[in-house]
């Protein structure tokens, strides 16, 4: 064998060895990645974050509970309660204790020593994670005694309070979910999670307006699902998110960090996030922008029938919504039953002698015309366990924490005592009480809380004769109704309160069919995030998807006829508003801020280094009777502050008038001087409403009408008398 041949064989062997070693090393790395432990995170949730104030326990056997969910892509592996507890000094430590249970399983019984009574103490309770499920209840039962002999089970000394600053620390481990469209909207939205929905959106650079419009439709759908939680949609261009996210791509515009194939039809798919294999990406794809929109519409309209790791959309068809066809607003076409306003009839029922209130959320059309009306009629039916004697048991009805009516709960009529009774058939129930009441118009806003508080009086039987059985049941009948069908739609604008609270006038069409959103710069992530935030908020307010809105640039806005305009922040938006609004109260123009105050009639121009944001509303210069709402600011921080103010429910009541200034977390509003009206009234309503605002003119009109009528009557009588005299004159 020659030396050359030997060297070739050795080289071949070494090359084979290196390739094998590299392959083996790659297999080991893949194995390590696949076998890597699932990520674990620790979350601390206060009782206040769970929607609870202080938990007050009153009586010998009182109960309070917390409710929360566990995400489908997480499993609880550890849980600890940190309680801040205050209890009565009168409790006997030998008999009294606080019992804690998780989903019906008792996990702890805390003693209540006298030495710690009367002031706040801290207790830590470790909970067994095996007891947790998708929906969880942590229940607190106070077992309280103040005497070794006869007791009053409702004695005022039997109490304990859990502070809202108490918290629950959850340790959760991620669960790998399969690539399955049938799980949607999980994991991108999980109704078990009560926190704000944060859902990143990924685009290639640059993203076209039509692509952003399609993404906005998806944002409105997720905002509708998020509801009270709120939703934010961080935007990234060619940068993978560090959590579950959405991807929007066409064949000509695909994010660089994803190896997406080209497609010929609208396609939906779920894939692993290359940044973290435990995270998922929902990918919307189309050959072009039209197909991309069809893919998004296929999700929001047909998610109930999606299965598998991917799906193609073959056809999408939908009709435009009519005005005021808004799922989350009370219908103006008919009376609405209370049962339609809750998810389950169980939400209209309570138990106990001091139960929590039954609460209904009433969302009215913001332009409901209630002028010169006594109010909104309610046909109320309710049931309750009748007290044994006439006492102070009552049902109190409030609207927005204002007392509306209070009804005495009376005993049932005495029966013959033979033990016989009628089984109710359909609505025939002898214990049912019916009341007609009217909610005063001045008590109502766009969003209202109507509460029904039952309070049953406890009867003390005497010393050592107490047998406490708290088996009272109370309910509001689901067939109770509220009727706004006789009201017209008419509103005075500009009024930013209607926009902040209900998205009006854009949400008058639930699909935003007469709305144009003006996006000044499609490459500006701040403006794009503002777009998605607002569309998600509209979805929350209407309960519908924004399928029909238009997305324009500032040049197209100049000719946007017969549309309400929503202008997003950006330098070009400031230029557009400056072009339109020499009479507007605030302008950002050429680095200056021009502010015009109506009281006194003055104008000032300033240059300032700090951030200033604003919400501005005025009548559209393009089409009279149409509305412009603009979110403007001096910089990106100001734009973010405006969005944050709209997303903070505690700040929304401060937004009103035609201008709201936003300086950090401080809001200041003012009322405009130029008012215009939208909607329609019957001719006589229009006449009386507008003349009522000018009392002197109305008086003069009435006098003129009376004089004209008198002259007409006088002239008619004169002619009638002349006809009667004509025959006599002829004779």
Short names for language-model regions:
Residues 1-8:
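N-terminal secretory signal peptides that target proteins for export/translocation
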Residues 11-21:
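Bacterial N-terminal signal peptides
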Residues 22-26:
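Sec/Tat signal peptide C-region and signal peptidase I cleavage site
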Residues 27-731:
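Solvent-exposed alpha-helical segments and adjacent loops
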């Amino acid at each position: 064998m020659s030396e050359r041949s030997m060297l070739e064989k050795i080289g071949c062997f070494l090359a084979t060895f290196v390739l094998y070693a590299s392959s083996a090393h790659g297999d080991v790395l893949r194995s390590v990645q696949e076998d890597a432990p699932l990520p674990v995170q620790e979350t601390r949730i206060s009782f206040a974050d769970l929607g609870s104030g202080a938990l007050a326990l009153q009586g010998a056997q009182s109960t309070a509970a917390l409710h929360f969910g566990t995400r489908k892509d997480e499993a609880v592996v550890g849980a600890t309660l940190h309680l801040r507890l205050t209890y009565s000094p009168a409790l006997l430590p030998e008999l009294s204790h606080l019992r804690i249970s998780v989903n019906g399983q008792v996990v702890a019984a805390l003693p209540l020593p006298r030495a710690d009574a009367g002031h706040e103490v801290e207790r830590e309770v470790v909970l067994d994670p095996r007891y947790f499920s998708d929906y969880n209840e942590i229940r607190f039962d106070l077992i309280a005694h103040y005497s070794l002999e006869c007791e009053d089970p409702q004695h005022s000394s039997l109490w304990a309070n859990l502070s809202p600053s108490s918290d629950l620390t959850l340790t959760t481990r991620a669960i790998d979910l399969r690539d399955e469209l049938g799980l949607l909207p999980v994991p991108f939205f999980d109704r078990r999670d009560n926190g704000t929905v944060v859902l990143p959106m990924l685009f290639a650079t640059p993203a076209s307006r039509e692509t952003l419009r399609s993404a906005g439709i998806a944002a409105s759908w997720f905002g509708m699902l998020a509801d009270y939680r709120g939703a934010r949609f961080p935007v990234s261009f060619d940068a993978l998110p560090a959590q579950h996210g959405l991807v929007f791509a066409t064949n000509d515009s695909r994010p660089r960090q994803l190896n997406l194939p080209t497609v010929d039809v609208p396609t939906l798919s779920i894939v692993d996030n290359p940044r973290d294999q435990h995270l998922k990406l929902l990918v919307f794809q189309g050959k072009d922008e039209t197909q991309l929109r069809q893919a998004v519409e296929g999700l929001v309209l047909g998610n109930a029938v999606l299965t598998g790791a991917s799906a193609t959309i073959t056809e999408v068809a939908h009709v435009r919504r009519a005005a005021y066809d808004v799922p989350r607003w009370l219908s103006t076409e008919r009376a609405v039953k209370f049962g339609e306003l809750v998810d389950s009839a169980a939400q209209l029922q309570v138990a106990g002698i001091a139960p929590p209130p039954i609460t209904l959320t009433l969302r009215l059309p913001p332009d409901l015309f209630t002028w010169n009306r006594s109010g909104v009629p309610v046909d109320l039916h309710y049931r309750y366990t009748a007290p044994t004697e006439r006492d102070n048991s009552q049902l109190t009805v409030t609207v927005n924490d204002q007392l509306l009516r209070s009804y005495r709960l009376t005993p049932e009529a005495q029966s013959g005592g033979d033990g016989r009774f009628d089984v109710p058939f359909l609505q025939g129930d002898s214990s049912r009480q019916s009341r007609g009441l009217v909610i005063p118009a001045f008590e109502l806003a766009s969003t209202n809380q109507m509460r029904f508080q039952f309070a049953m009086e406890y009867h003390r039987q005497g010393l050592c004769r107490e047998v406490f059985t708290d088996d009272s049941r109370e309910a509001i009948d689901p067939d109770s109704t509220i009727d706004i069908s006789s009201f017209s739609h008419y509103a005075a604008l500009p009024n930013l309160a209607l926009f902040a609270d209900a998205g009006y006038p854009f949400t008058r069409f639930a699909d935003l069919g007469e709305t144009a959103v003006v996006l000044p710069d499609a490459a500006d992530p701040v403006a794009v995030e503002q777009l998605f935030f607002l569309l998600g908020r509209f979805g929350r307010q209407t309960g519908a998807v924004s399928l029909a809105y238009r997305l324009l640039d500032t040049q197209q806005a100049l000719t946007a006829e017969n549309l309400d305009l929503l202008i997003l922040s950006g330098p070009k938006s400031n230029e557009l508003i400056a072009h339109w609004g020499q009479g507007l109260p605030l302008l950002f123009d050429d680095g200056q801020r021009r502010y015009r105050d109506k009281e006194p009639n003055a104008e000032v121009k300033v240059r300032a280094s700090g951030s200033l944001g604003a919400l501005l509303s005025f009548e559209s210069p393009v089409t009279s009777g149409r509305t412009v709402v603009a979110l403007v600011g001096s910089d990106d921080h100001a734009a973010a502050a405006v969005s944050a103010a709209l997303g903070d429910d505690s700040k929304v009541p401060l937004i009103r008038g035609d201008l709201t200034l936003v300086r950090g977390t401080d809001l200041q509003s003012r009322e405009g001087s130029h008012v215009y009206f939208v909607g329609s009234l019957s001719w006589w309503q229009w006449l009386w409403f507008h003349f009522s605002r000018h009392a002197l003119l109305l008086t003069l009109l009435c006098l003129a009408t009376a004089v004209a009528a008198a002259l007409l009557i006088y002239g008619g009588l004169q002619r009638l008398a002349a006809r009667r005299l004509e025959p006599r004159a002829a004779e």
